[in-house]
């Protein structure tokens, strides 16, 4: 699986590293479903801005993780930045400002009418993006590089980073990739316990870190008291989500569900969800959905198994929605079933409980309010960051 587990006391060089001009943390974020790329393309105002201003404005929109971990780390006294390695327009903007040679830009201006040149361009773009990321790590010389799942890297790249960083961390929240260099990282964090067991069986140091909620969102997005008396499902559907698709299709025949997300084309032709599809929701629009609906339903995907590992649970609970989710291992350590969250074991129970909640909005609101209070108390990114620092043996800087 890779090199042996790093037994160095992680974080020992934190203070001496800072005196050398580097930063403490550099986060390498996933461009989940091209959300950052699409947000950049959709806003011409960003195109003329210098990289730093552009990135700050883009990350402040709460797309995917937004700047939640950056804010939490800086609140703990660390210097922290993040980049999105596969957000091509943003990375190319950084390269322009840093005077990094980028052959993709001038090759893109050449006419390409056949398939082969397109493939060549794609390979070149991948090489250029890898090179830009390496330059960013060299220029920042972070003590910790934290890579998030969904960003493909080779073992040789991670080894190259090590020349300019103290430690490499990985967050993983999707199915395992063949040939991914998991063993090159000092610590892998995951919200799915079964993944942690797989890593530990390979001799890789791994630790449990659940998803979280950015508490700043409720200062910008209203949590409505009078809510839409329907169910919202926000998420993705794909050919690999057969159980989720069949479950939601059947449930939508019993209770009113509005679907936000991607993959509507994979639903059965006669599915009510096709008629109640509301498009995709990112950033503050996503949180507005959670803050507006009475009930939010969740169904795990295969890799999550029976674990309470979905980001959606914390986002919807943080916005005060009454979350209905399948009974999961470890859920009771996060939320109190029946009081802060509603659980089901099968389709029939799910439908029956949702019908009860829709007929008794006061009960649903009471559960949502308790869930929000629990989330703000125990499940913010600040709390997750403190847990991470404990794993690393790092204290906040004075």
How should each PLM-predicted stretch be described?
Residues 341-347, 356-361:
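Conserved acidic donor-binding segment of nucleotide-sugar-dependent glycosyltransferases
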Residues 68, 72-140, 145-178, 184-186, ...:
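Internal alpha/beta domain cores that form substrate/cofactor-binding pockets in large enzymes
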Residues 137-138, 290, 354:
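Short hydrophobic patches on amphipathic alpha-helices
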Residues 17-87, 91-95, 99-100, 123, ...:
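Nucleotide-sugar donor-binding catalytic core of glycosyltransferases
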Residues 359-392:
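A charged, aromatic-enriched C-terminal amphipathic alpha-helix characteristic of glycosyltransferases
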